Amino acid sequence: MADAEAAMTFPKKHKKKKERKPLPEADVAEIQHAEDFLIKPESKAAQLDTSQWPLLLKNFDRLNVRTTHYTPIPCGSNPLKREIGEYVRTGFINLDKPSNPSSHEVVAWIRRILRVEKTGHSGTLDPKVTGCLIVCIERATRLVKSQQSAGKEYVGVVRLHNAIEGTAQLSRALETLTGALFQRPPLIAAVKRQLRVRTIYESRVVEYDPERRLGVFWVSCEAGTYIRTLCVHLGLLLGVGGQMQELRRVRSGVVGERDHMVTMHDVLDAQYLYDHHRDESYLRRVVFPLEKLLTSHKRLVMKDSAVNAICYGAKIMLPGLLRYEDGIEVNQEVVVITTKGEAVCVAIALMTTAVISTCDHGVVAKIKRVIMERDTYPRKWGLGPKASQKKQLIKQGLLDKHGRPTDGTPASWTRDYVDYSDSSKKATAAEATPGPGVTADAASIVKRKRDSDSDADEATPTTTPRVKKEKKKKKEKADGGEEAAEDGDGDATRKKKKKKARAAEELSG
């Protein structure tokens, strides 16, 4: 049996190795001599495809470049790569608000679920209204004001009290209610019922059911528009009367119902998974970075060294600018970002794109709202020549700890240094430098004239209208008193005369 098994064994198949043809040494040498292995200089840099980059860095290669030189600082991080605690505290939720609870209740529940200190929303929805409610968390609440004033879109159902001709008539009536409209809040409203003007940008009829007299419509409008009032006006315009049956908000600002809208259950599940399984992926899908709300703004990219100064309220100056967008207009709202794509602040532009490209100094924008936390980036101000000299003098004891001059302060420092935080020194500096085209003699003459005018004013005190009125009243009162006294004396003499006449008659009688 064993012999049979031995006979049954099959021979092992050996894999054939692929034969490699060795390259002759001469050929390698020839290739090395023939080809130039170097990075060749080019007239233009290769194009980066940044169309798929996230949030505020999208298409950043299309921004105008003021300078490409800056010193990167290893602080901060890309908004999508923040540590989970920081990510939640600087994020927002595009929530599908359920029917029946009020907006404030929903926001309070979210705060309790995520265990954060502060939450806010993008505009109140009535209890029965559903749809897009942007819930901002902690740092993102700084953007609530701008989100509340952003445009909104709704889909509503209107019930008409009587039959109409058809969809065309409803469509014409809805088209009439476009543009600036007078509105008074409904009877049951949380605000004062004052007449107000609100703008309807666009509207259209989606569907009309003549049997049930129900019409579905879509409307894009200004923040604070009452769709309930719009439905009442629509009924009046059609001559049959109408009321709002149902309403859903489909867009709030730049975020719509198709942009990763989540429910309250999703938020609860995401927090549960993180608490019990340390799985933060679901939480990152529910919460989005606040930078997503600012993607419609024009961008200004700042150097890393200028970021913390802006967080402390410094002006946005041109030397700290790296890149800027096309089409910036004066008084337009812009967003200031870092090189990593983090939002630093929302600002009001003071220069147009054309002016920024031609100037080398000046204030580019003024801060409207700082978003980033202070000291996320290190302090980089106070490193200039004057500031360094001041620090040295404080160290040597020639200035006090606040930088104020002492007895041992060098005369050159007190003469040359201007402390712009001291208002008295500002005034003296302004007086010392008269305006262009005005000589010192002319300035002194003007000053002398002012002094003489003030002396004259002191010599002749002016009486105010109030004092004059009081004097007039006193005079009238005094005159009235004298007249009354005179009248009283006359009455007394008359009475005496009458008494004398009666006494004489009695004696004669």
Swiss-Prot record:
Transmembrane segments: none annotated. NCBIfam families: CBF5 (TIGR00425), PRK04270.1 (NF003280), unchar_dom_2 (TIGR00451). GO terms for biological process: box H/ACA sno(s)RNA 3'-end processing; box H/ACA sno(s)RNA metabolic process; enzyme-directed rRNA pseudouridine synthesis; mRNA pseudouridine synthesis; positive regulation of cell population proliferation; positive regulation of telomerase RNA localization to Cajal body; positive regulation of telomere maintenance via telomerase; regulation of telomerase RNA localization to Cajal body. Its EC number is 5.4.99.-. There is a cross-link at K21, K40, K44, K192, K395, K425 (Glycyl lysine isopeptide (Lys-Gly) (interchain with G-Cter in SUMO2)). Residues 481-490 have a biased composition (Acidic residues). It comes from the Eukaryota. It catalyses: uridine in 5S rRNA = pseudouridine in 5S rRNA. Residues 1-25, 381-509 are annotated as: Disordered. The modification Phosphoserine is found at S388, S452, S454, S508. It is found in: Nucleus, Nucleolus; Nucleus, Cajal body. Residues 416-425 have a biased composition (Basic and acidic residues). CDD domains: PseudoU_synth_hDyskerin (cd02572), PUA_Cbf5 (cd21148). This is H/ACA ribonucleoprotein complex subunit DKC1. The modification Phosphothreonine is found at T460. The modification N-acetylalanine is found at A2. Residues 297-372 form the PUA domain. Residues 11-20, 466-475 have a biased composition (Basic residues). It is an enzyme of class 5 (isomerase). Residues 2-22 are annotated as: Nucleolar localization. Part of the H/ACA small nucleolar ribonucleoprotein (H/ACA snoRNP) complex, which contains NHP2/NOLA2, GAR1/NOLA1, NOP10/NOLA3, and DKC1/NOLA4, which is presumed to be the catalytic subunit. The complex contains a stable core formed by binding of one or two NOP10-DKC1 heterodimers to NHP2; GAR1 subsequently binds to this core via DKC1. The complex binds a box H/ACA small nucleolar RNA (snoRNA), which may target the specific site of modification within the RNA substrate. During assembly, the complex contains NAF1 instead of GAR1/NOLA1. GO terms for molecular function: box H/ACA snoRNA binding; pseudouridine synthase activity; RNA binding; telomerase activity; telomerase RNA binding. It holds the Pfam family TruB_N.
